[in-house]
Amino acid sequence: MMCLECASAAAGGAEEEEADAERRRRRRGAQRGAGGSGCCGARGAGGAGVSAAGDEVQTLSGSVRRAPTGPPGTPGTPGCAATAKGPGAQQPKPASLGRGRGAAAAILSLGNVLNYLDRYTVAGVLLDIQQHFGVKDRGAGLLQSVFICSFMVAAPIFGYLGDRFNRKVILSCGIFFWSAVTFSSSFIPQQYFWLLVLSRGLVGIGEASYSTIAPTIIGDLFTKNTRTLMLSVFYFAIPLGSGLGYITGSSVKQAAGDWHWALRVSPVLGMITGTLILILVPATKRGHADQLGDQLKARTSWLRDMKALIRNRSYVFSSLATSAVSFATGALGMWIPLYLHRAQVVQKTAETCNSPPCGAKDSLIFGAITCFTGFLGVVTGAGATRWCRLKTQRADPLVCAVGMLGSAIFICLIFVAAKSSIVGAYICIFVGETLLFSNWAITADILMYVVIPTRRATAVALQSFTSHLLGDAGSPYLIGFISDLIRQSTKDSPLWEFLSLGYALMLCPFVVVLGGMFFLATALFFVSDRARAEQQVNQLAMPPASVKV
């Protein structure tokens, strides 16, 4: 009896082991079926065919949603790679682009640094340009306004092209173009100021291609918090490049003894960067990081895309808020170094410059502050947003709103402190810029969340057009115009040169407060607009495939 019981137990144990082995084989077959390359040929035990029971895709926010069922596919088709089976199936992951993603993001960020370095090199030698060409504040402000006007007109065109053609080729051609124009502008004779104005307009066209398309490539390389981090690095290039523009302009002018040489640095670096983009940046598929690969193309007309964007309330309000940021940064970036120089003339700590080369100290200090506050602001904004996302789904626009409203207070204090203390003015600039710069990367991330991949380049272009049209396209000229208008009604003196420019710049904090209100309005609609974008992505995805072997 004991032997029978032992044999029975052994047989039962063998049967249980065989059953366990059978279950393990089935699980392995199911897991192979869920994988990218094995889904079409996955087999269960005994050669039974395995068919896909469901399909899932990753959404814009990183969550996983079930895609709609569709007609069967055939072996080897792209749709087969998305098939998942059973409760033990692995979640799909975006196809890897390898280590080149980080290098590509770094090169794109470097290009953004050069764009803004070139843009603000002119501001770094603005006083020399005024003395060389004999223009007043209004004429000096025209340089930046013409640049921005051409920039905003070209941006929608490049947005359309960026959603439909090879993006890295467009980027490189844009860099090569503005580099050539900037280098040529350094040889313009003294009597042809209008040629310098025209050249800045042409540079704006070249730089529009970059600012419109580059963020969408980064958006297609990364997702979720990684995308926020990479966009933070990319948009840190704005204050970094702006600060380096002031520093480069003033330093090269001092070293060469001629401000024209300041315009010959960025073109050389631009040619190198454009070549690196052609060689090292991958030709990324639109929607790649959103688990869509080849599945998304620009299927809708440009007019339909525009209508959809205008109806997107989060996009509209965040674009208006971005316009307020552009207004303030454009005006302050253009005029603050000159304003602080005039403040020191009034305080008898500096002399009025009557012929170039003029002093470079204020541009150097302001450039260094802009670089550091840009880094601090972008890091602080990204970190605050990641922490607040754990508390609320509306974290992105709320962090932007707090930064804007806080910045307005310290921008106001700049003009109070500058009357008696330059150090106090620099402290207010430091805090105000840090808070103002905290929203750049977050605003770009808001756009990525609420706009589907096939419309992102168009969305960036339209947002760029709007922000420049309502922002820095007119703010430098407007500030110069108001300053000259006030000076015409007063006696010509260093005191009124200082006061008139300060009164004109007081317009900036009020616009910044308005921008904070627009970010609060964005928070009201952000959650629903993001959910709608995720739903549209799922509808655009190609139908899943299930194959019976």
Swiss-Prot record:
Membrane topology term: Multi-pass membrane protein
Region (Disordered): 14-39, 61-97
Signal peptide interval: none
Domain of life from the UniProt record: Eukaryota
Subcellular location: Cell membrane; Endosome membrane
Reaction catalysis annotation: sphing-4-enine 1-phosphate(in) = sphing-4-enine 1-phosphate(out); sphinganine 1-phosphate(in) = sphinganine 1-phosphate(out)
Family annotation (InterPro entries): MFS (IPR011701), MFS_dom (IPR020846), MFS_spinster-like (IPR044770), MFS_trans_sf (IPR036259)
Membrane-crossing residue ranges in chain numbering: 141-161, 169-189, 202-222, 229-249, 261-281, 320-340, 364-384, 398-418, 422-442, 466-486, 507-527
Gene Ontology cellular component list: endosome membrane; membrane; plasma membrane
Any single Pfam family the record assigns to this protein: MFS_1
Biased composition, class Low complexity, residue ranges: 77-97
Keyword match Protein biosynthesis: no
GO BP annotations listed: B cell homeostasis; bone development; lipid transport; lymph node development; lymphocyte migration; regulation of eye pigmentation; regulation of humoral immune response; regulation of T cell migration
GO molecular function, one term: sphingolipid transporter activity
Keyword list, A-Z: Cell membrane, Deafness, Disease variant, Endosome, Lipid transport, Membrane, Non-syndromic deafness, Transmembrane, Transmembrane helix, Transport
Claim: Manganese is one of the keywords in the record: no
Recorded disease: Deafness, autosomal recessive, 115: A form of non-syndromic deafness characterized by severe sensorineural hearing impairment in early childhood. Sensorineural deafness results from damage to the neural receptors of the inner ear, the nerve pathways to the brain, or the area of the brain that receives sound information.
Physiological role: Lipid transporter that specifically mediates export of sphingosine-1-phosphate (sphing-4-enine 1-phosphate, S1P) and sphinganine-1-phosphate in the lymph, thereby playing a role in lymphocyte trafficking. S1P is a bioactive signaling molecule that regulates many physiological processes important for the development and for the immune system. Regulates levels of S1P and the S1P gradient that exists between the high circulating concentrations of S1P and low tissue levels that control lymphocyte trafficking.
PANTHER family xrefs: SPHINGOSINE-1-PHOSPHATE TRANSPORTER SPNS2 (PTHR23505:SF4), SPINSTER (PTHR23505)
Record-stated family: Belongs to the major facilitator superfamily. Spinster (TC 2.A.1.49) family.
Record protein name field: Sphingosine-1-phosphate transporter SPNS2
